[in-house]
Every structure is written in structure tokens, then in C-alpha cells.
Amino acid sequence: MSSSIPPRLYDMSPTESKKQEDVSETELVYPVELADATIQPSKSDDDLFDSNDFSKTYLAKSRILSNAMNEIGFGRYQWYLFFVAGFGWMSDNIWPVCTSLILMRLDEVDGPHPPAEGRAPYLTLSQNLGLLVGAMVWSLSADTIGRRWAFNLTFLFTGVFAVIAGASPNFASICVFDALWSFGVGGNLPVDSAIFLEALPSSHQWLLTVMSFWWAIGQVIANLVSWGLISNFSCPDDESVCHRADNKGWRYFLFTMGGMTLLMFAARFLVSVYESPKFYLAKGDDYKAVETIHKIARINGKTCTLTVEELYAIDRQEQEESDLDDSKSSDAKSVTQGTTNLIVEKLRKYNFEHIRQCFGSRKLAISSILVILSWAVIGLAFPLYNAFLPYYLETRGNANEPLSVAKTYRNSLIVSAIGVPGSLIAGVLVEFRIGRKGTLCLSLILTGVFLFASTTAKTSNAYLGWNCTFSFFSDIMYGVLYAYTPEVFPSKVRGTAVGLAASANRILGIFSPVIAMRANLTTSAPIFVSGALFIFAGILVVFFPYEPRGKSSF
């Protein structure tokens, strides 16, 4: 008996009946007549990985799923994902920016007198600790339990604790809630990049770079809201004593941004996203992988010739080969075991195999080490400078004439808006001959160069101009970095690998507020350190072994 799914977005709602969701079993198992089923060559010109990196069986099956996705093409389901997954990029930038925007406005949280000098960096430290734990926990869960759980729950954590933070009675509680909402934020990119990339045909993988458009938009939204709320509901600059009744802007700001995050959670939850077919493949559930491919095809209004028998045929051939080594036999067993294991069993058997597989071959190990190291270096460089950007804008230029609160947040908005076209340009550049590596290398070096140049500014307007240039190139850099990283890891370890890179980024990010506590921010030293780190990261990119342009990412 066959049932179909009309190509409408609301058919993805979890309230739809299971009967309407199911794809015909006959359609999945009995295809057009199958040619001789053989494991395809270890690598074609369009593949990024070969059998030295992962098992021949896994790569052959993954290639079949990629070809099926290419057959379906880019359609309604991918457009939907472009928006709801884009929320993850927005959130990843909104909340670190939110921390920097409220840093200088917490005068009244422990009474009417200003806080002790040097206390503000502890808030950034709390944020980075939360981001670190979130990156590790959510990314590992994405490769063991599944992408969908983390895809939804990260936003719930973030929104709830951000709203609660707006009612914080003291500075210590703000730090605690900042760490908790950052725990949710830490899982956005490792999970969302995986679920979006694995639903794309190879011809549209460049869209993963364009997703950084949402990252830039998140910064614009945060700065726009802060300009309207914090600048109008904060203690006047000329008052030496700040009372809570006069300083509610940062609270209104957190209520607003937390509420917005909960709305994005509702959008994801009410119109659900399918689990990634390649996650099912990595877990050995070939049937569910093929079923999900067919569901996506129906939403796009397309037909798909893929059947589960094509995947089973690869297993049969491998079992017939007597010269398989133990590691391949173990892999074949895991591929055929199905989804009868419970979540608890999956976690019990998780013995860091996912982490080991990120370094499975010499080439893959070199790639993993360099990518993780680059993320770590950038993790120190960016927050060292950007987390304290409002402070820099307020205190630099025109000798001893600080900017007003309104002008400080206006300038932050201008800087963030300049980054939006940079994100879009990044999506174009990665398809040119210089590819992902060339674009990433140049944007990193130019980011560092313009940070150096900003130290020559003598007025606040000149400093603002240099910061706009920095914002433009740094958004190009982040767009490519966030796309390149999931592309150069196979789907079976993609969440873990991106999580490792993000964790390294957060670990080094923890040192930025520590440095700020010890450094003199009235000098240009933090800027020089940050610029040098960006240039060093650009040099590392030259040695990346993989170039994903024009390749299928499995």
C-alpha cells in the first residue's frame, strides 16, 4: 500500500499523521532494475575523500546518497532550511555581541554605585566558558543521538536563560545566566552547518558560505535593538550615581533578544526538520536514510530513483570479499546493525571513536590539526578585540572626549552593517579559481592588516572607518571558515569535528578577558596582538590539504 507526501512545507509539521509521512515501502526497496551492484572506485574526481580516509563501503554508500540529493536538486525543502538553519548563524553572533553591548551598562546591578574597575571582563569569561561546554556537548550529541534534538534544544536553552538574565539581581547572577545561555549558543554552528550541508546538492554547497549572511544580520539586529533600548534607557553620562530605575535599557535588551530567540525556537519546533539522511547512514539505518531522501524529494515536487536495495547490495559485496581487514569488518557490522539500539546504548558505546576518526589518515590528520589550530588562533584574536569594541569606540579618538552612549551604539551598528555585503561577497569568491582556501587566506591576512592600520586613527571617525573595513573582511573570513570546516569532514564525524574546532576556538577565547584584565586597554597593544594572530591564521590556511571547491562533501 502506497501513500504520498504532497510537496508542501506544512507537511513537515510533527502534528501530521504518520500515515501521511510514510513513504511507500515498495518504492524504497524495489527500484527500477538494478545494474550489477559493485562498490564504486575509492575516489572520483568529484570526491573530496578517498578510501585512505574512511572505509570504502561508507564512501560508496555516501556517494549514492549524494547522487540522489543531486538528482532531487535544490528546492523548497532547502529554501526552508536556508532560513531556519540561518537562525543558528544569527544566534551564534547575536549573543556574544549582546554580552559586549551590555558590558559597560551594568552600573546598578549591585547597588547605586558603579562596580569595581576591571569587573566587566568576568562576564566575557562566563560567556566563553558556556560556549566551550556547549560546543563540546551539542556537537558530540549530534553524531550520537542525532542532529534534530540539538537543532531545536539549543534555541530553547538560549532563549529561556537570556530572558531570566534580564531580571538578574546582581552581577554574579548575570555571569551565571550568561554562561547558561551561551551553553545553548555553543551548539548552533556545529549542528546547523551539518544539517544544512547534508541536505544540499553538491552544486549548491557554496550556499554554506552565504549562510554567514545571517551571521552578519544577527550582529546588525543586536546593535540596532541596543541602540534603541540601551542608549535611551541607561543612566546619563554626567551622573556619578546610577540607580536601577534609570538603567533598565540592558534589561529590556535581554528581554527582547531572549524573546526573539524563543520565537525562532517556535518556528523550528512547529515546522520540524527531518533528521539528516547521512546521520542515518552513519548509524547503519540504510532504510531510514533512503526514506528521508524520498520525503525531501516529495516536498521539492521531484521523484527519486534511489532504493535501499542499492545500499544493501554494497553490504553484500563487502561480505563476499574474504580479504577485508578487521577494521573494515567492524565498520561493515556497524553499517548493517540498524537503529534498534536505544539512545542510552549509543552513548554507552561512545568511546571517542568519532574523535579518532577525525584523524583517521595522514592527510585527514594534517587537515584536522591545521583547521582546529586556525580556529583556536582566531578564537583568541577576535574576542580579544571585538568583545570590547563598544569600549574602544567609546574611549578612543579625540583625546579625552569619550563618545556619548547613543553615538557609541550608533557606531557599533554602522560597523556591523558593513559586514553584511562581505558575507554575500564571500559566497561568490569561493566559487572562483582561488577557492575556499585562497579566499580564507586573503581575508584573514587583510583583517589583520586593517587592525594594524586602525592604530593610526587620531579621531573617533577615523577609528570608525578602520573598524568598518575590519568588519567587512572579517565577515568574509568567518563566512568561508564556517563553510570550509564542515565541508572537509565526512558526515559520520562532522558534528564532532566541527565541535572540536569550535571548542578550541572557545578555549582560546577564554584567555581574551583574562588578558584584558591584565592589559592596559588605553594602549594599542591588544589590537597589535589581535592583528598578528589573524595574519598567522592566514598563513596556516596555505597548508590546508583539502580544497572543497567543485567537490562533493560526504
From Swiss-Prot:
<keyword id="KW-0597">Phosphoprotein</keyword>
<feature type="modified residue" description="Phosphoserine">
    <location>
        <position position="334"/>
    </location>
</feature>
<keyword id="KW-0256">Endoplasmic reticulum</keyword>
<feature type="transmembrane region" description="Helical">
    <location>
        <begin position="171"/>
        <end position="191"/>
    </location>
</feature>
<keyword id="KW-0813">Transport</keyword>
<comment type="similarity">
    <text>Belongs to the major facilitator superfamily.</text>
</comment>
<feature type="transmembrane region" description="Helical">
    <location>
        <begin position="82"/>
        <end position="102"/>
    </location>
</feature>
<feature type="transmembrane region" description="Helical">
    <location>
        <begin position="437"/>
        <end position="457"/>
    </location>
</feature>
<feature type="transmembrane region" description="Helical">
    <location>
        <begin position="210"/>
        <end position="230"/>
    </location>
</feature>
<dbReference type="GO" id="GO:0016020">
    <property type="term" value="C:membrane"/>
</dbReference>
<dbReference type="InterPro" id="IPR011701">
    <property type="entry name" value="MFS"/>
</dbReference>
<feature type="transmembrane region" description="Helical">
    <location>
        <begin position="364"/>
        <end position="384"/>
    </location>
</feature>
<feature type="modified residue" description="Phosphoserine">
    <location>
        <position position="13"/>
    </location>
</feature>
<keyword id="KW-1133">Transmembrane helix</keyword>
<protein>
    <recommendedName>
        <fullName>Uncharacterized MFS-type transporter PB1E7.08c</fullName>
    </recommendedName>
</protein>
<keyword id="KW-0472">Membrane</keyword>
<keyword id="KW-0812">Transmembrane</keyword>
<feature type="transmembrane region" description="Helical">
    <location>
        <begin position="497"/>
        <end position="517"/>
    </location>
</feature>
<dbReference type="GO" id="GO:0022857">
    <property type="term" value="F:transmembrane transporter activity"/>
</dbReference>
<feature type="transmembrane region" description="Helical">
    <location>
        <begin position="253"/>
        <end position="273"/>
    </location>
</feature>
<dbReference type="InterPro" id="IPR036259">
    <property type="entry name" value="MFS_trans_sf"/>
</dbReference>
<feature type="region of interest" description="Disordered">
    <location>
        <begin position="1"/>
        <end position="25"/>
    </location>
</feature>
<dbReference type="Pfam" id="PF07690">
    <property type="entry name" value="MFS_1"/>
</dbReference>
<dbReference type="GO" id="GO:0005783">
    <property type="term" value="C:endoplasmic reticulum"/>
</dbReference>
<feature type="transmembrane region" description="Helical">
    <location>
        <begin position="149"/>
        <end position="169"/>
    </location>
</feature>
<feature type="transmembrane region" description="Helical">
    <location>
        <begin position="462"/>
        <end position="482"/>
    </location>
</feature>
<feature type="transmembrane region" description="Helical">
    <location>
        <begin position="525"/>
        <end position="545"/>
    </location>
</feature>
<feature type="transmembrane region" description="Helical">
    <location>
        <begin position="120"/>
        <end position="140"/>
    </location>
</feature>
<dbReference type="InterPro" id="IPR020846">
    <property type="entry name" value="MFS_dom"/>
</dbReference>
<feature type="transmembrane region" description="Helical">
    <location>
        <begin position="412"/>
        <end position="432"/>
    </location>
</feature>
